[in-house]
Every structure is written in C-alpha cells, then in structure tokens.
Amino acid sequence: MIPVAEFKQFTEQQPAFKVLKPWWDVLAEYITYAMLMIGVFGCTLQVTQDKIICLPNHTSADVVSQITCQEYDQQSPPSNDSDLETTIPPPTATSSPPREMSGLRNNLDLQQYSFINQMCYETALHWYAKYFPYLVVIHTLIFIICGNFWFKFPGTSSKIEHFISILGKCFDSPWTTRALSEVSGESSQEKPSQERSIDRELSKPNFEEGSPATADLPIAEKLVAETSSASVLDKKEGEQAKALFEKVKKFRHHVEEGDLLYSMYMRQTVLKVCKFVLITIYNAVLVGKIHFIVPCSVHTEDMTGYNSFCCNHTKAHLFSKLAITYLCFLGVYGLTCLYTLYWLFRRPLKEYSFRSVREETGIGDIPDVKNDFAFVLHLVDQYDSLYSKRFAVFLSEVSESRLRQLNLNHEWPADKLRQKLQHTPEGRLELHLFKLPGLPDTVFEVAEMESLKLEMVNEALIPPLVSKLVRLEELSLINCTAKVQHASLAYLRDHLRILQVKFDDIKEIPLWIFSLRALEELHLFGWLSQDLSKNPALESLRELKSLKVLTIKSNLSKIPATVADVAGHLQKFSIHNDGTKLLTLNALKRLALVKELELVRCELERIPHAVFSLTNLQVLDLKENTLHTIEEIISLQHCRKLSVLRLWHNQIAYIPEHIRKLKGLEELSLNRNKILVIPSQLFLCNKLRHLDLSNNEIRELPPEIGVLQLLQYLGLSGNFLEDLPNELFFCQKLKTLKLGQNRLGNLSPKVGSLVCLVKLELKGNRMDTLPPELGNCVSLKRSGLTVEPSLFETLPVEVRDKLKED
C-alpha cells in the first residue's frame, strides 16, 4: 500500500494562509484532494493486484488484427481451473440432449503464463490503461503545486507571511477596538443616523457561552467582547500598537511598489486553466482505450507453442469508472479556475478603496491602496471583510496620532512635567520639552507655567486645553512644526505675548503666528530665501497689532518691506544676518517709532544713512560688521534721543573728534576694534555711564577722563597701557574698572577713593605689589578683585581679611 501521509508534504501549509484563500480556492483544494485519492487508489490496485491475465488462442495469427477474441465476450466466465478453460456453447433453437463437456489443454506451465502476461502487458495494453492512475497522481500534484506555489516562492511567501502576521496582530490589538469605538462615538454625536448603523454592527447581543449563535458568529462575538475593555489601554498595549503602526507603514511602502503577488496569482491561475484544458481533452479522447478484453500477438512459438493470445485486463472496468469520475471532478475544478480568471479580469484588483470603511467608522483619512497591497486586501475580503475594516485603523494618521497622544500622556504625567520646570533669565517659569513625538495633554494641567519651549517636537498640536494655562505668556518653537485648532488660536491670539520660532526650513514657520494680535515680541531664527517673494512667512505682519519687538536672525539681502506694516508700534528691530551682506536698508526709514536698532553681522562698511532719520532711536547696535571708519557719526546728532551706541567687534581705527556732538550718549562700546588713540573730545560726552574700549591698541589714557563724573563702567583691558592718569580716580561713581592684560607697572594709591568700586580687574599686568589703599574701597570684595594670587598676597593681612569678608 502507498501511505497517503507521504503526500502530506505537498498539501501542507500554514493555517494562517486561509485568510488569503477565497471560496473558489478552498473548493479547488478539496477537489484536488478527491482527485489525489482517486489516483492513489488506482496506483494501489495497480501495484498490489494482477495487471493482466492471458490465454493462448488456438487459432494462429501473424498480427494482432487477425486475432479474434469476440467469442470470449459471448462465453461464460472461466472455471476455477487455471489450466483448463471450459466453453459452453450458446443454446440453440432446438435443444440437444445434455452431453459431457471437455476443456482445451494448453500444455503451459505457470512460468510460461507469467511470461506471456508480462509480455502482453507491455506490448498489447494501451499506454493510457497502464499509466492512468499515475497520470492522475502527477496531474493532481501539479495542480496542488500551482495552487500553492505563491505561498512557497521566496519572493511572494515572505510578503504573504509578513502581511498575515501584521493582519492578525491588527485584528487582535485592543487599540483597534478602542479606535473604532471612539471614532464611532464621535461620529454618532455629529451624525445620529450613522450612530444607529454603527451600533447595529458593533453592539451585537451577548450570547451565552456554548450557544449555537456563538459558534455561528465568532468574529462578531470577539469584537463585542473587546468593546467592553476598549476604554482601558495600558502602556504595554500602547507600545505594541505603536510598533504595529510602524510595521504597517513599512509594509505598505514595500508592497505598494510592485505587483508581484498579483502577477504570480494570475500566472498560476492561467497555468491551471491551460493544464485543465489539456488534461480534459486527452482524457476524454483516451478513456475509450480502456478495454476489458485485449488481443495480443507475441513471437513465442519456440517457448510456448503459441503466438496469439486473448488477455483480460482485470481492472479495466474499475479504471474506466474512475476515469469518468476523475473527469467529473476535473470539470468542476476547471470551472473554479475559469471563475478565478473571470474574477481577476473583471475587477480592478490593483486598487482598493476604503470608502465604505470611512463612511461606516467615521475615520475619514484612511487612504486607498494599490498594487499588491490592494490585491491581498481583496482576497481578505473574500474571507471576511471585518479583517480589512480593523486593519484600516492602522492606516489612519488620525488613529496613529491619537495613539501617540495616549502613549505620551502615559509617559509624561503632570507631576513629571512639573519636575522639569525651570526659571528663565527673565524670571519666567518655563517648561522645556525636547524631541517628543507630540505634545502631551498633561502639559495643560501645569497651570503655573509661564513659558513653553518645544524643541524638535514632531507634529505638535495645540488643543483648546491651552486655555487652562492662564499664566502662559511665552511660546518657543525650535525646529518644531506646531498646529493649532481654531479654539486654541482664538485663545493664543489674545493672550500670547512672546513668540520665538527657530527653523531650518521656511515651511516650519506656522502661518497662524501672524494672526496673534496680542503678540508683543516675535523672534525668527532660520534661513530664508534670498528672494523675498518666496518667503510666504513674511508676506504680511499687518495682523500683529501689538508687536513691539521684532528679531530676525537669517541671511537677508534686504530688509523686508512688510516691516512697514508694524512701523506704527514697533519699538525694537533686530537683524542678525550671519555674515550675509545687507544691501538695501531703505525700509528702515519707515520705522519712525523704533527706539532700538540692531544690525549684527550684516557686513556693513559704514553706518547706514537710513539710520539718521530715526528720530526716536535710543539704542544703535552695529556689532560684528566691517566698519573701518565712523565719520558719519556726526549725523547721529539728528537722533536726539540716542543714548546707547555699540560699535564693537569691528575694524574701526580711530574715533572722530566730532563724536562730542553726541551729548546724550550714556553708553559707548568700542571694544574689539583697532583704535590707537582716544581723542579728548570723547570726554565731552559727559553723560557717559558705560565706556568700553577693551581689546584695542590704546597706549595712553587722556587725563580728561576725570570729566566723566557719571561713569560707572570703564573697560580698558587688552590694550597697551603702561600708566594711568590720576584724574581717572576722580570718577567717584565707578563700579567696574577693567584694566587686565595691559602693561601697568603699578596702581596708584588713589584707587582708594573709588568707594563704589565693586569689580576691579588687574590680571595680566606687570605689577609687583598692590596698594594697601584698596582696603578703602568699601564695596570691593575678594570675589570682585581679579588678580594673580601671588599679587594678592602682597596686600597687608588686615586688608586681605577685609576683602575676604562677606
């Protein structure tokens, strides 16, 4: 016997593959099992029983066509004697009296019969009658291989296994049920008519365990059972759902690129149809070649004495019936293949629309898919459309964002966020969130927060809950794309005062920020296009009715004309141009009310003429430009309110004498230039409180320095001073005196008259001793005295102790 288990390897496959087997494939599979059983049964009979039985024909014949075996059909079956064959003549019209019958003697032994049987089986029996069961087995195995080839082929099986694995996890995920129930609940509030249809589908009645209805509806029951626990999703389940979203994205990107699965399925179906047609034709033609009586002619006279035989094919009757049965099964199998082809070509299987799922669930952003991804979903629908519905949840960005939000809320509770609160230099209580996948809802429970900084937070969505942050004044968006809902924008529009936006791409600038009418400070940091027409972010500032401070750190070639939209209330305007030459500054003339102007790293070679028309200007900062001369400084006398002038980090070689015209100057910063001489006219600016001339090439300090009776800060470090005039110590209000990195050999004892001195820097000079009069500087402490330790030890003990006192 041939054990059927030997054929198990040809039909064995993973049970999970059943979701990709529509009804016609299942029917075809069972038909192949039936055909395989027919073939195996025939092969078993062929191997275990006699194939053919032959008897000699006493009439000699040279060829097979001359052998007449028709009398065997008319005679009764043979007797039990194997060597004798008794023939009974047919009855005649006139009955003759009974007579004794005698058989024919063939004078052949058993070996001769076996030899003749084998010779006639090989030469006289038609090949179809001999190999019919083997052909059935072979053809059936080919059908089985064709039907399951795409489950085994490496290029397709990997995708199928991956898809089935993801599909099962998506179906069983608690997040699937929760997302469907939440969205359906929201949809029911907006669309009562949809509520009834969704409830009828999802809210099936609970059947008792073991009831027949439970067995009939396993998937619906499972959905209902999960709905009861859908409201609770722990952290582990949330992480698993998050991983599923990533897997679905990668799988979709990988599978939608080609149509290998569709092509393989179609080719194997076409191959099955072609094979079906071929097998049907030749079987229908040759089934008549199976005969019960077979004439045989072999040249065996020398061995047996006979050359013609009449043979009986013992299994002919059974094989003919099996062949007809096989053809019937084959016909049904062929019909399933033809229907498969009809299904393949009738419908657009390379496109799959979730329109019905979107309408039913209310999740409106589920995308349609194509190519192989669409094809496998069509197959899944033939098994159970509920799989596609639950799988669609993991294609929705809305669903993913809700899950991300839920995971964020688990990871960042309000107490944990409060631990991250810090004070900014301005004294505000700030919460800094860095590299989060979103904005946790728990942020809006920290009501004491005054400043919120979001750095590299992906897709931050500011919900209406922001209205709970009643103390929120400042918002910082650093490489972060932030979106706001309408209610959120209405609140921010009236409450947000300070906004900072740092971006690498201009698309990261949210356009809603230009509608914040209560905004007082706007700081933009990032690269903008040189063509301002391509900068939609700066198209209009007209809505910023309260803007007082505007800072742009970018690479502008000219000042945006839209700055004029806020000219009526702008008080401070700053441009940090990062080394890009600022060519056009005509727009500055419109900023008549500006009090502070900063043009940093703009590659300016002279003081811009547009500045001189700013009559309300109080602070001018031209840091890190390429100024070589400042002869135009005389025109600054038109800026009558100018009190702070910062020309630091430039290449200025001298100070023009007409600087004396700037009578209102209170701060002058000329540090890090190339100044050699300080003109005495500078000290006619007798309102100076802050004078910084550090890191220049100054060798002498004019005695007129004593005129500056209001001076509180004097920076002369990093020069070539060898001596200090005694008049310097007439500046009784000096609080900070920086003399480090010079060539001073001593410090005048008159330094003791500087009773307000808080900070004194002397490190890097050529002094041997310090005057004991430092003890008279009652405001000076050791922490404010910057000097070498060895030089400090030259002071008397009592002076040192006094300086060390708190």
UniProtKB/Swiss-Prot annotation:
Q: What is this protein called?
A: Volume-regulated anion channel subunit LRRC8E
The residue spans the entry assigns to the Cytoplasmic side of the membrane are as follows 1-22, 152-275, 345-806
A single GO cellular-component term on record: endoplasmic reticulum membrane
Free-text domain note: The volume-regulated anion channel (VRAC) channel forms a trimer of dimers, with symmetry mismatch between the pore-forming domain and the cytosolic LRR repeats, a topology similar to gap junction proteins.
Write down the species: Xenopus tropicalis
Whereabouts are the LRR repeats? 544-566, 569-589, 593-614, 616-637, 641-662, 664-685, 687-708, 710-731, 733-754, 756-777
Q: Which cysteines does the record link by disulfide bonds?
A: C54-C311
Subcellular location(s): the record lists: Cell membrane; Endoplasmic reticulum membrane; Lysosome membrane
Listed A to Z, the keywords are: Cell membrane, Disulfide bond, Endoplasmic reticulum, Glycoprotein, Ion channel, Ion transport, Leucine-rich repeat, Lysosome, Membrane, Repeat, Transmembrane, Transmembrane helix, Transport
Record: glycosylation sites = N57, N80, N312
Give the compositionally biased regions (Basic and acidic residues). 188-207
Write down the InterPro entries for this protein, in alphabetical order. Answer: Leu-rich_rpt, Leu-rich_rpt_typical-subtyp, LRR_dom_sf, LRR_domain-containing, LRRC8_Pannexin-like
* Subunit annotation: Heterohexamer; oligomerizes with other LRRC8 proteins (lrrc8a, lrrc8c, lrrc8d and/or lrrc8b) to form a heterohexamer. Detected in a channel complex that contains lrrc8a, lrrc8c and lrrc8e. In vivo, the subunit composition may depend primarily on expression levels, and heterooligomeric channels containing various proportions of the different LRRC8 proteins may coexist.
Q: Does the keyword Transcription regulation apply?
A: no
Q: Which GO terms describe its biological process?
A: aspartate transmembrane transport; cell volume homeostasis; cellular response to osmotic stress; cyclic-GMP-AMP transmembrane import across plasma membrane; monoatomic anion transmembrane transport
Gene name for this UniProt entry: lrrc8e
